[in-house]
């Protein structure tokens, strides 16, 4: 232990005495903060949730980057990969055609499959 500093075990003990809980959130890989003009993305995130007096605070460490917002008029639809693969497998069409069919069917895979097989 370095003179004048506490080791991590001692720090955790003192925090517990003060009613502060610290929890590592190991399953988090990415954190995104959505802003008005930009999004702030933290990849390979290490997140710690600290709870004190009923208030939860998050500490995030990782690779930071900013991304500009996409144009609102150019909103691109995205569909779950499972839905796209299902349409492709059931109808034998290419990926682009499956996505077009999902767009026409408002994202409903069953309707997209019916539309493609009835043509």
Swiss-Prot record:
The gene is nac. Belongs to the NAC-alpha family. This is Nascent polypeptide-associated complex protein. One of its GO terms (biological process) is protein transport. Keywords: Protein transport, RNA-binding, Transport. Homodimer. Interacts with the ribosome. Binds ribosomal RNA. It comes from the Archaea. SMART domains: NAC. CDD domains: UBA_AeNAC. Residues 5-73 form the NAC-A/B domain. InterPro entries: NAC_A/B_dom_sf, NAC_arc, Nas_poly-pep-assoc_cplx_dom, UBA-like_sf. Contacts the emerging nascent chain on the ribosome. It comes from Thermoplasma volcanium (strain ATCC 51530 / DSM 4299 / JCM 9571 / NBRC 15438 / GSS1). It holds the Pfam family NAC. The keyword RNA-binding applies. Coiled coil: none annotated. One of its GO terms (molecular function) is RNA binding.
């Amino acid at each position: 232990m370095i003179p004048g500093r506490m080791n991590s075990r001692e720090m955790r003990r003192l925090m517990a005495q003060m009613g502060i809980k610290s929890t590592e959130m190991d399953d988090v890989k990415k954190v995104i903060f959505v802003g008005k003009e930009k999004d702030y993305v933290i990849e390979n995130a290490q997140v710690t949730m600290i709870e004190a007096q009923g208030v939860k605070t998050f500490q995030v460490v990782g690779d930071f980057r900013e991304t500009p917002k996409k144009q609102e008029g150019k909103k691109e639809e995205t569909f779950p990969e499972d839905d796209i693969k299902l349409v492709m497998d059931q109808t034998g069409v290419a990926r682009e055609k499956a996505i077009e069919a999902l767009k026409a069917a408002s994202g409903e895979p069953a309707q997209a499959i019916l539309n493609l097989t009835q043509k």
